[in-house]
Amino acid sequence: MRQMTGTMLLLSSAVVMVAPWAHAEEKTIQLTEAEQQEIKTANEKLLGLTLRFLHDSWPLEIMFPGEVQEEFHSILQCHQMLEQFRQTGNLLLQTPDRTTPLHLCIALGLNRLAVRMVEAGAPVNAQSIFMHDGTKEPGDTPLTWACLSGLYMNSTAEERLPLVHALLKHGADPDQPGPWGVTP
């Protein structure tokens, strides 16, 4: 399995593409050196968790062939997009499943940076794609991720409150349903 893991890493990193929003003018944010370092550190944790997930999930690969590799590939795309965001500050980047830098900064507990991103024009109603039983359904918005508990690294509900306020102030729709029709 370890040999297969290395193969999956090589295959996955070779085919990752990050596409900006179609027909949108570029929106960027000037990241401070401290923010760039914060993103780099969080992104390294994300990659570490990904490799740990892969190592620990070999029984799942046996029971559900291909699903672990698909999940790994998705997380690797997030890692690469976040690195591209760190280098360019482009707020409109997205992975093929429509996860944005704002989604990831929220998920990684980078709340102050996420507030700055919202204020700089990051798409507050961007909705990822949720794969369920082979179908594509509307996924979560940044507001949903900001309201969820247990998704974040080093982030309490109290620390996320200014982010929730910023998202709502800048037009996040609190009634936009995600998977199974759940709203934030």
Predicted regions, residues:
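Bacterial N-terminal signal peptides that target proteins for export
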Residues: 1-9
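Bacterial N-terminal signal peptides
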Residues: 8-17
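Boundary at the C-terminal end of the N-terminal hydrophobic targeting segment
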Residues: 22-26
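Ankyrin repeat (ANK) core detector
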Residues: 47-55, 61, 65, 100-103, ...
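Ankyrin repeat structural motif
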Residues: 75-85, 110-119, 152-168
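Ankyrin-repeat inter-repeat connecting loop/turn
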Residues: 89-92, 124, 174
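Ankyrin repeat boundary/linker residues
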Residues: 95, 128-130, 136, 178
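Ankyrin repeat A-helix N-terminal signature
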Residues: 104-110, 137-140, 145-160
